């Protein structure tokens, strides 16, 4: 598994519209080689036709508290290509990185996050997550803080829209552009409608629809270009990966937990794997 494929500056641009249809027999041969190589060799396996990007889910959340700056830095330290995060807008319109719709599970506070202001959110401390005892006064990051971290650590930003306002889209795109990350960034969502708003401000930011791979879903997105499907691991097959590639879509697979799962996905030709773990 190639965790950071090629030069960061090239980002996603080389992959756009250039999905390769790999000979099935060759794929089987490559998968066989991967399976017999020791795990320490898999991360260095870099054939020109196999360049699967590893994205840290909420950063490297198996090792650090999710959706925090330490988690994103850890993803970079582990050599991950990208860092996925979750985006909310607050009562005052501020944009912050957080997964849940309330702060109860992850912080020393209670309440719905969208009912809070940035000042109120920054007054909270994150008190849950892996290795949380290492940290005191760990804070919920803003979108700007996340983007600064990605830029500094050469991570591709992968931003899931959790609950934001349509009026926030331009601000999100402007912030991505302002940090010099427009060519590399990915926005994902369970609603395909967001691609229409994103395309008003950028054609360079890739949009990935969190859904199944189907011709129906592909047709919802295809006309807007630079798109993909973000699909759960148990919903992906060689056939629907081929369908996506034939229609110019990239395939990002999430909920991947083991090297065995990753090897299978490499074998059927997926483009990206999202995981809490460093998969060798």
Give the location of each predicted region.
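Short, Lys/Arg-enriched N-terminal segments with co-localized hydrophobic residues
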Residues: 1-18
């Amino acid at each position: 598994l190639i965790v950071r494929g090629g030069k960061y500056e090239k980002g996603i641009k080389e992959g756009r519209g250039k999905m390769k249809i790999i000979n099935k027999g060759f794929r089987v041969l490559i998968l066989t080689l991967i399976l017999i190589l020791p795990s320490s060799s898999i991360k260095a396996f870099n054939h020109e036709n196999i360049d699967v990007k590893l994205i840290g889910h909420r950063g490297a959340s198996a090792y650090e508290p999710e959706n925090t700056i330490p988690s994103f830095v850890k993803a970079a330290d582990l050599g991950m290509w990208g860092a996925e995060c979750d985006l909310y807008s607050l009562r005052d319109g501020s944009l912050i990185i957080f997964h849940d719709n309330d702060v109860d599970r992850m912080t020393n506070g209670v309440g719905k996050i969208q009912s809070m202001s940035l000042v109120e959110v920054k007054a909270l401390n994150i008190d849950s997550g892996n290795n949380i005892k290492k940290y005191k006064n760990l804070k919920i990051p803003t979108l700007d803080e996340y983007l600064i971290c990605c830029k500094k650590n050469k991570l591709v930003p992968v931003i899931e829209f959790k609950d934001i306002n349509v009026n926030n889209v331009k601000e999100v795109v402007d912030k991505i552009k302002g940090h010099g990350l427009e060519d590399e960034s990915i926005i994902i969502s369970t609603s395909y409608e967001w691609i229409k708003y994103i395309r008003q401000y950028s054609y360079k930011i890739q949009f990935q629809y969190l859904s199944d791979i189907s011709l129906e879903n592909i047709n919802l997105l295809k006309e807007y270009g630079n798109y993909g499907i973000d699909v759960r691991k148990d919903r992906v097959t060689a056939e629907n990966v081929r369908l996506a590639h034939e229609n110019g879509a990239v395939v990002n697979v999430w909920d991947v937990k083991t090297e065995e799962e990753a090897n299978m996905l490499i074998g059927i030709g997926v483009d990206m794997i999202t995981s809490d773990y460093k998969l060798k």
